Amino acid sequence: MDLEFGRFPIFSILEDMLEAPEEQTEKTRNNPSRAYMRDAKAMAATPADVIEHPDAYVFAVDMPGIKGDEIQVQIENENVLVVSGKRQRDNKENEGVKFVRMERRMGKFMRKFQLPDNADLEKISAACNDGVLKVTIPKLPPPEPKKPKTIQVQVA
């Protein structure tokens, strides 16, 4: 007797899944939607700190193993900082060499940060040192307080 959920025989479905050929399992493991999910996780897994100083904002983004020329820093929509790039694995193919374990994420990554209104977008600087990208955005000086306007009262 097969347990049914709605109109679906649960045990038969599970049995079919367990007996699925390995190549079918491999196809589903590498399908495009899974690749998109891996990319989305990689983007979210790029750690960053945002530090506010009295005169600037500093964004420290971990970039281990990435060369400075593989990193892009941009401003989009007038107030969004975008840090993007691509981690690439060495293409050295040695015969008989294979990966036993691959934990480091490879591929494209992107982080976006909403900038505050007082960020000086004309004076942004970025430097990558020891695998950490630091983007420094100075703060605009606070606007001068408006002086009260005195209106002359006319006497009639």
UniProtKB/Swiss-Prot annotation:
Q: What GO CC terms are in its UniProt record?
A: cytosol
Cystine pairs: none
* Keyword Cytoplasm carried by entry: yes
| Source organism superkingdom | Eukaryota
- GO MF entry, a single one: unfolded protein binding
Instruction: Extract the InterPro entries matched here.
Output: A-crystallin/Hsp20_dom, HSP20-like_chaperone, Small_HSP
Q: Which GO terms describe its biological process?
A: cellular response to hypoxia; hyperosmotic response; protein folding
User: Where is it predominantly found?
Assistant: cytoplasm
Q: Where in the cell does this protein reside?
A: Cytoplasm
Alphabetically sorted, this entry's keywords are: Cytoplasm, Stress response
The chain positions of domain sHSP read 39-156
Q: What is said about its interaction partners and assembly?
A: May form oligomeric structures.
The similarity comment for this entry is: Belongs to the small heat shock protein (HSP20) family.
Q: What is this protein called?
A: 17.7 kDa class II heat shock protein
- This protein's species is Arabidopsis thaliana
